[in-house]
Amino acid sequence: MAKKILYQDNARRALERGMEIMVEAVSVTLGPKGRNVVLEKSYGSPQIVNDGVTIAKEIKLLDHIENTGVSLIRQAASKTNDVAGDGTTTATVLAYAMVKEGLKNVAAGANPISIKLGMEKASQYLVTQINEFAQPVEDIQSIQQVASISAGNDEIIGSLIADALSKVGKEGVISLEEGKGIVTELEITEGMKLEKGFISPYFITNTEKMEVSYDNPYILLTDKRITLVQQDLLPILEQITKTKRPLLIIAEDVEKEALATLILNKLRGIINVVAVRAPGFGELRKQMLEDIAILTGGTVITQDAGLSLDNIQLNLLGQARRIIVNKDSTTIVSDGQTLNEINIRCEQLRKQVNIADTGYEKEKLQDRIAKLSGGIAVIRVGAVTETEMKDKKLRLEDAINATRAAVEEGIVPGGGATLTHLSENLVTWAKNNLKEDELIGAMIISRAILAPLRRIAENAGINGPVIIEKVQQQEFEIGYNAAKNTFGNMYTEGIVDPAKVTRSGLQNATSIASMILTTECIIVDDVKSSNES
């Protein structure tokens, strides 16, 4: 296929046009008075969302060059979502504001490489400032505030997540399920999270989240390597196929031939299966498999017990209410049938902790106790329609991620107030520490970081620049409450953002924007020539 090549300002402007289209679609959701976006689906009913990264993933333009701009800015949203789990809309708005400001200066003759250096130095300065101003999250009220803001000012969701975290702890697992009624409920159930993910991405059932999710599965536990399905697994697979239930295999390893056979059976729809390597090493691996067996009511297939894979029955397999497997971890939600056995096992492990010889042994035993007894918080999402259900689930996911981020790195004033206040600090610092085009780069950042507050105000129907000026005249804690159209202390009003979300959004936006500003040429497929041919 022939290629289309654009140089210099033409290239950068084409990228900017694509970015602008996407930012307009995403930024309407920003703030308490942000609107929703309707996404057409190739199957099923349209989806109504208020989540930046979900909207960003749906946008694809006809013009290949403009679409490249969309893809680049989408990276800022996706990376922020991967690191912090929230703040995707803010990252998108920031990246575009930086590009827009930067292009003016590049067109006027400033050196893009020096601008990039200045932007990076300014970003590093702002990150240290954010960390300095961040307040630790210690009480349940702060957790509730963060969760409520992230869920679109939904206080009910906020209190649910705060309740869930207080019950399962900071490291605990919170799982989302579709409820049967219209009320969203919280349930604490037995369960375990393993630090091992699927062996192959071909097992994925949900491509949007890149995860495997099955209800009511059988669980096969073994400390052996599975080499050939025909030799090792065929009898038990035939039994499971008759039940039409999915299967989770946790083994030392699944070798290429066996893995290929399992994937083929999954893709053909013969059996829903996912394979995971057993966690730990050596003796610890066997002990952890025993723990999983107790949780799921199964038996570990091991030669020590005189068991082999080729002659096992269904009664030796474990069972669970639900499993969720991604590339890094496996979450098993128990069906609650083995509560008594779990308590006995935990008591045995506690006794072993008391007589353990080394600190390492104690640490591993305590880790196993925590995994067995910690439990999993299951939030059953209730809604009137399926469309509302999907929107609620996205909001809950954002809120859970934001809350974890807040516990990790603390909170800062929300509603764009933190970056607005730091803009003036940055100007002072840059004038004292940078010069020439590097100073211009820092000034680009200082103006761009006002964009989130401006957009929040505009979405509420208020003049953005006026709000920015008023906020900058106040103390650091004071910001703009768009929901009430008032100014006040962001901490006492509960309008707070996780420092990690603000930090990662800023860093990813700076990274993408500085790369675009240093672009001198774009090469894309020429659609016209391909159509003619």
From Swiss-Prot:
Top-level taxon: Eukaryota
Record-listed E.C. numbers: 5.6.1.7
Gene Ontology biological process: protein refolding
Keyword Protein biosynthesis assigned: no
CDD domains, per database record: GroEL (cd03344)
Keywords from the named record: ATP-binding, Chaperone, Chloroplast, Isomerase, Nucleotide-binding, Plastid
Subcellular location: Plastid, Chloroplast
Main location: plastid
InterPro entries, A to Z: Chaperonin_Cpn60_CS, Cpn60/GroEL, Cpn60/GroEL/TCP-1, GroEL-like_apical_dom_sf, GROEL-like_equatorial_sf, TCP-1-like_intermed_sf
Catalytic activity: ATP + H2O + a folded polypeptide = ADP + phosphate + an unfolded polypeptide
SUPFAM superfamilies (UniProt xref): GroEL apical domain-like (SSF52029), GroEL equatorial domain-like (SSF48592), GroEL-intermediate domain like (SSF54849)
Any Pfam family matching the protein: Cpn60_TCP1
Residues that hold ATP according to the record: T29, L30, G31, P32, D86, G87, T88, T89, T90, G415, N481, A482, A483, D497
GO cellular component: chloroplast
Functional summary from the UniProt entry: Together with its co-chaperonin GroES, plays an essential role in assisting protein folding. The GroEL-GroES system forms a nano-cage that allows encapsulation of the non-native substrate proteins and provides a physical environment optimized to promote and accelerate protein folding.
Family listed: Belongs to the chaperonin (HSP60) family.
PANTHER family registered for this protein in UniProt: 60 KDA HEAT SHOCK PROTEIN, MITOCHONDRIAL
HAMAP family, per the entry: CH60
Descriptive protein name: Chaperonin GroEL, chloroplastic
Organism of origin: Phaeodactylum tricornutum (strain CCAP 1055/1)
